[in-house]
């Protein structure tokens, strides 16, 4: 009994000594922390606020960037063309997401030699909302069109994300290349707004499969847009890892050497027109064009007089130079 009591007493003294030593160590560690906070408390507070804002923005970036539910019926109703040869198509991506496409067929003279435009739309609505624009392209340019609904848009499955949209674009291009009724040497990418970033990425990764690139009212990158839209906040100082979606078009455009047409509406109130000008200047294409429309707004530049004339002239140049690249280096700025 006495032995057990002695052992218990020794263990108790050892535990008390350990607790006393631990407390002393904690006080030693806390002292520099307290001194640091007293000296740099304001800096630490600002850093905590900065990290908190970055965390909130990272979490809600998808909500701020993607609007598949605007208008409210966009996931339920997809307008379809009437009286026009078309196909309503569903394909699968590499990660097994089902995408919805609409193929509009040009059936006029020499239709077997017609170029095919893959149309990447902006960050809201669905492919049906782009039909008025697409049908005018069909008639004026004598081309086939494939309109793409990204994952999470229209009748496509999944949720939108930067990497997801890139995979969607690759799946669409792969599908187009399997069609025996499409001239695979005349594939043109068209991207408006967010679709421009998707088109630039696809072109940068598939230069050997793309005949030409057409960009309309798109941006340099999401960090550039954040600095523009939230100019009162220090967004320009956020490191890239704070951005869930980056879409670094200004870096990728330098890999796009195919003939390129840049369409800029100077009345765009969402994406500053200077971004289109910078993308044009960054482009290494030997055949590049910049068409400027002073009255063009973000979504409605295609309604400006001369819009389809600029596109038609560009496509005629492609046909005369036999895609994908002209031999002579030419650049041109047209104000319409």
From Swiss-Prot:
Gene3D superfamilies in alphabetical order: alpha/beta hydrolase
Domain of life the protein comes from: Eukaryota
Membrane-spanning residues: 37-57
Keyword Ligase: no
Chief place where the protein resides: membrane
InterPro entries attached to this UniProt entry: AB_hydrolase_1, AB_hydrolase_fold
Topological category with respect to the lipid bilayer: Single-pass type II membrane protein
EC number: 3.-.-.-
GO cellular component, one term: membrane
Residues bearing attached sugar chains per UniProt: 299
Active site location: 193, 268, 298
Alphabetized GO MF terms: palmitoyl-(protein) hydrolase activity
Record keywords, A-Z: Glycoprotein, Hydrolase, Membrane, Signal-anchor, Transmembrane, Transmembrane helix
Family indicated by similarity: Belongs to the serine esterase family.
Record localization: Membrane
Annotated protein name in UniProt: Protein ABHD13
Gene assigned in the entry: abhd13
Enzyme class: hydrolase
